[in-house]
């Protein structure tokens, strides 16, 4: 396969060759400059900071001395912020945005994903100590739906961090994988501590006001090194429990009025075929207990000044059992089938309606889903070696392995129907929660389920959803890097290296459960229950209700306090009536396996002159991709699996090899002692998301099997995302803790991943067609296209008076794609405003973060946007003695509303998660 040099690659190669060719006498000060640079780098590594202002100055120093455009957060700075995982801390960096969900499940109260410069989370690479980390998601939609390259930061507590380096421009020596940039989390090492013995511990409580629960939080670290500093051991552990509650109103898709529907034939003005109406409107109550436990260890050996050996590891396990209830308006049964007594139509959408039917109608449907044992996990083991072979030649090695998973072993489900003679809804615009009501009693169970007067198409106690879900993720890597001091003109040194890795991601043996009786109508239900068609003895009695303050702050009118089943009742109900046959209910459409073998090599030259420095380099990468997934066939083909209720499936294998050349150049011009001017150009790449390469086919309900349905799927032929990036920045260091910077960037994403439509015939199963029927679908699938992103970032921090100071930054971003679809993750503006105070015994910080609306992905075959959101956090610390202090922290103090809407300016969801308060005692020795 031939590889063609891009313009950036050619420029970098010429610059590097020219630098090598310059005679040594061209700059007699090269050796002193190199020595000064090395000393400067060593000084940065050995900085020990305490206090807010000292840590901010340390971050400023590291940014100032870096050869490329970076932002740095130190452990002390993170510790003085009201942050509970690394993503919370990164939210304060200009150009970095966070989201509190992995995909389209809606946000929670903790930061989850990190993205840079107006792109999606998958285009930002997360490293720990320079290597990748395997990860997993606890939420079922993140496990089977949006399965991206991004890391879940809910597994990364802030306590494990020594520093975080945000690379806004690329270098050849950096591991490839971040189109927009990369984030390197540096963990603590025992020989870095000043004292021979370091002990620190924190114990505290967290109160979450919406669930009204208090839980314990604990963290401890012990670091020891011998007196001569040649051997050290560090052990750290954490255990953090929290209760979550999320109140929400969800609009789950839209259906279309057909010409044959009664509502279209009634002759009412504006109520015609083609008008869309909400499929489901629900009041969704999510409850969860999260327990994050784990720790780190580090063994560091330095037998001489020339050799350092380090073995380190990390483990984080998150138990995330949850229950999701949704009491819903059943628009699918009303919008076309019932003629409204009053209504409004706006821009082709039925935005409100009232229905009256004395004979009764199926006005609502109620889903209760318990996910016991849900969770996520991440761990790694890494060995690093540093060898100063000669005065001029240094070698470093890295060998490691990382594993992770996300799991949902079972979903215990019950779906019941709500009969009524009156029902109504109102959508209330794209930025507000929808409302709905019926004249049924929501607070008590009453006679639930099947009633021939209402409808028997959807029976009582229906069971659905995938189970036996465990997404395994792993990576193994080996790396060898060299650095040779040249001191030839402006060329200070040459860096070179090679890296090999294997990444694997898989999900096999998914079970698409259903009820024990395939046709769960009145007769089958009665047979299963051992009674008449009106006998509901199978249904357990209600065990409780929604909280009385559910939905406070959402400004929606909803049925009050729906009755509930307990998780134990749902488990018992499913144990008796769920069909989880691993053969007949095998859901092969959700299975996939992916393996990537990557080989990379690079050459980089570090440059330095009298008032400038920089680097140029080239990284060559080969990716061998092996994707396996099942393809559905309407007619069985030779070798197909034909035992699944979901149709005929054949295993499909796709292999590709991709070669990429990634040049880079970074230059830092020192205009004077206070001002730096930086320029950078690079070509970057990120491999396609796992769900894009091997995504399962998912489709919505079909009212008429003779019409064309819609759904989504994957594309194993996707090429990696590549981009030509350009960056310039101006930095003005005005004094202690005082700096201003402005930067501009442009990304020409030459191989972005967008969406297109393909036509397929699939085996469709519903209650009316238990054995399946061939239905045509238009599936939205990912394809390679192109995009452009550009923006400007401003940052300012300064002391004000006494112990007071302020930090502020603003990012302005714009993007476009070749197919004119919105670009994932682009917020036109985001900003952070912060203030701090510090003296010998008291420190305080106040932080306001804002992010404007952005495209979040596809949900129910429609573009899905998150509305603008802001959050307020604060921390207060009181120092009792040198070894003991207390902190009080608050997160989400403004009780932010998370709003989502569709591309057609219709509401999708509104959520509130409440506020969280942390009281913690810290001890150190």
Write out the residue ranges for each language-model feature.
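Outer-membrane beta-barrel signature, preferentially recognizing the C-terminal barrel domain
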Residues: 376-378, 586, 590-598, 656, ...
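Extracytoplasmic beta-strand/coil segments of soluble accessory domains associated
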Residues: 87-136, 168
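N-terminal periplasmic "start-of-domain" segments of outer-membrane beta-barrel proteins
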Residues: 48-81, 133-144
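C-terminal beta-signal and adjacent terminal beta-strands/loops
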Residues: 137, 518, 852-857, 877-925
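Gram-negative outer-membrane beta-barrel transporters
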Residues: 744-749, 753-760, 764-859, 894, ...
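Outer-membrane beta-barrel transmembrane strands
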Residues: 184-187, 203-206, 214-225, 280-324, ...
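Solvent-exposed loop segments that connect transmembrane elements
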Residues: 247-283, 323-368, 413-464, 516-541, ...
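Outer-membrane beta-barrel translocator/receptor signature
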Residues: 143-151, 159-166, 173-268, 279, ...
